[in-house]
Amino acid sequence: MKKLLSLVIIVVGIVADQIFKNWIVANIQLGDTEKIWPNVLSLTYIKNDGAAWSSFSGQQWFFLILTPIVLVVALWFLWKKMAQNWYFIGLTLIIAGALGNFIDRIRQGFVVDMFQTEFINFPIFNIADILLSVGFVLLFIAILTDKETK
């Protein structure tokens, strides 16, 4: 049952990410900003050919090699730790987010980012980035609370 749930979460995450990215590209000009919640959140369409804070900008080969490795490792750990909920949820979200951005990199050579926080200086991000970030936080919690690793 958990395998099916993991697959559903991954597919829903990827579909939501890709649909929203396509909507952004179709409705907002590159570099333009649409206010959603003044002084809190805007939509700003950018093409990101790097990672967070534009690190590794222009190094697509790095992500095209790294992402499949991360996916294989995450899938292996998901298989081994599926019974433990923190691992299960965290790794499932990491896989969904990694695949969402990987699809962009393969299809377009860059990742579409759009969420811009206005109350803090933070990199513009997308749904896949949210999935990855939440997944890594949950994975960290899983590692800290794992009785087998203590």
Curated annotation (Swiss-Prot):
GO cellular component, one term: plasma membrane
Subcellular location as annotated: Cell membrane
Membrane protein topology class: Multi-pass membrane protein
Disulfide bonds: none
Lineage top rank: taxon: Bacteria
Enzyme class: hydrolase
Keywords from the named record: Aspartyl protease, Cell membrane, Hydrolase, Membrane, Protease, Transmembrane, Transmembrane helix
BP term (GO), one: proteolysis
Pathway linked to the protein: Protein modification; lipoprotein biosynthesis (signal peptide cleavage)
Main subcellular location of this protein, as a coarse class: membrane
Sequence intervals crossing the membrane: 5-25, 59-79, 83-103, 124-144
GO terms of molecular function: aspartic-type endopeptidase activity
Reaction catalyzed: Release of signal peptides from bacterial membrane prolipoproteins. Hydrolyzes -Xaa-Yaa-Zaa-|-(S,diacylglyceryl)Cys-, in which Xaa is hydrophobic (preferably Leu), and Yaa (Ala or Ser) and Zaa (Gly or Ala) have small, neutral side chains
Catalytic residues (positions): D113, D129
UniProt KW Transferase keyword: no
Pfam families to which the protein is assigned, alphabetical: Peptidase_A8
Its EC number(s): 3.4.23.36
Family: Belongs to the peptidase A8 family.
Role description: This protein specifically catalyzes the removal of signal peptides from prolipoproteins.
Protein name as annotated: Lipoprotein signal peptidase
Native species: Lactococcus lactis subsp. lactis (strain IL1403) (Streptococcus lactis)
GN (gene name): lspA
